Amino acid sequence: MDDYVGIMPLDELKAFTDRTYEIMMEKDPQPNEIGIFRQMAAARKEWIANGMPLFWIERMAREFREYFTYGVMEETPFKLSNTYPSVGRYLLIRMYSIGQKVFVNLTEAAMGQALPVHIHEHPAMNRLRELQSMIIAIQNDFASIRKELATDNETLNIILVVMHEYKISLEEAIVESLKIHDDMVREIDSITVCLPDFGFYQKMVEDYIYHVKIMIHGLNAFYYESGTKRYTQEGFAIPKYGTANEQSLDVEIKYIEHEYWIKNLKNNEHKYIGKT
């Protein structure tokens, strides 16, 4: 979905956001509307048929809207001006634009039960989901860096944002970005070893958190093991709103800790020094 809406004009994106919310709130699409709306309606009906409660459906609708409003729309000014956000602002935006605040809810659908509202909204649970989103966003940025170094107009990647704000080399930015990632992983572990007492729901919460962590591992494995070209220079989206100007970049990038990055990506750092 992010490829479809990521370079959509803001007026169209606003209408798309409103229509998404309506459909998730049980207003069926018209036969002539795009397939993504019909798929959303079909998914919503399947979730309801499988016993997911209305408050969970409403949460999905709300968090889809936040994905567009606080994620995709917040990225647009930086894309249009080809400028960098600060590291702090970037992480806030990416926490939404990565889409995980929406899709982490599917953990409950897979479990066949929704967390009660008072548990879902507990500060510890909210923080776990925020951390999960930002960790996955950073992992996504590492997986995408080879593709994004192949174009001259990409600024929304944690490595490039860190490099720009701290005025350091690409090699140093990779190391610093890994530190940010690892600090968040440690924070998740620190919270989960000292959970609040949720009483009757404690086992459900522990199962939920287990699957939240599995999503982090699973998505990171997908980036490198699925064979997708989504994260290579062949993976640029070229919808009606944009064009592709990517260049060939013969750099192999593996897992997040792979030293091959530092040796090979350093050759490309000159492209990003001085961009404001």
Where are these regions (language model features)?
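Alpha-helical, largely C-terminal catalytic domains
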Residues: 1-276
